[in-house]
């Protein structure tokens, strides 16, 4: 009924009882296909609402790399920013050119939850951000270091979600 390309998006929006029901009736292959398409944070949200036997079934049907990343997100305190963040975003280096950045987005963007804002990182530390609009409208030879916005508002993964909400409201981030 639903094209495979949209199934994970539809599944992620379902209520937890419907998700639980479907996980129970899916074949192993159907479950693997779904889990391969679900974004990591959606998988974590699913696991938090399922009984232990279904959690085990899901974890058995994801590859070890994804399982490790899931466990990492599950270890954040329930009310922390880390428990609701996405880890599937476009990250770039400061010496990357616009042309290289666009090629990187074309190559990896399909697997990212968000491509509208790209994060410039060095040694896992946030240096700045650039938007997709910036990349599409700037000269191909400019580097991220030349383009990136460095006056950014950031929080720790352990920051309480309420505080994150206050910052979003204060700075009009939604």
Residue ranges and their predicted role:
Residues 1-174:
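Hydrophobic packing positions in regular secondary-structure scaffolds
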